[in-house]
C-alpha cells in the first residue's frame, strides 16, 4: 500500500457510514466542489436537501482541523476535493402478514472533503508574474490561434 504524501496546504475530513444514498449525497457535493468555504456554507444552508446537513458538518469539521492543526484562516479555504463513495448496505427484516418478512436495504456512504489554503498561491501570483513564465503556446491573447476566430 502506497503512503500518501502530506501536503502543506491541504486539510481533510472524512465522514463514514452516513445513512444516505450515494446519489443523493453526490447531488449536493457536485454543487460545492471548487467553491470557497464561506460560499459553501451559504449554499448548504439554503439547499432544501436532507443530504446537506451531514456534508455541512464534515466541511465545518475540516475547517476546524485547518484552523487548529495548521493555523489556516477560514476565509482562505477552498473546497479542493469532495467525493462520495458507496458504503456497506444495512439490511433489516420487516415483519409481514402470515409469518413472512420483507428485506429492507438501508444504503450508507462515505464522504471525504479536502480543503486547500489558497493564500499561499495568491502570494505566489503577486510575487511572480505567472504569464511571463508560461510557455509560448499557452499565451492565447491575439496570437492568431483558433480561439481568436469565431
Swiss-Prot record:
Tell me the compartments it is located in: Plastid, Chloroplast
Gene3D superfamilies (alphabetical): Ribosomal protein L22/L17
Name the domain of life this protein comes from: Eukaryota
Gene Ontology molecular-function annotations? rRNA binding; structural constituent of ribosome
Which keywords describe this protein according to UniProt? Chloroplast, Plastid, Ribonucleoprotein, Ribosomal protein, RNA-binding, rRNA-binding
Q: Where are the transmembrane segments?
A: none
What's any one GO cellular component for it? chloroplast
The biological process GO terms on file are:
translation
Q: Which Pfam families match?
A: Ribosomal_L22
Family in the record: Belongs to the universal ribosomal protein uL22 family.
Complex and partners: Part of the 50S ribosomal subunit.
Q: State its role.
A: This protein binds specifically to 23S rRNA. The globular domain of the protein is located near the polypeptide exit tunnel on the outside of the subunit, while an extended beta-hairpin is found that lines the wall of the exit tunnel in the center of the 70S ribosome.
Under the heading NCBIfam families, the entry gives: rplV_bact (TIGR01044)
Q: What is this protein called?
A: Large ribosomal subunit protein uL22c
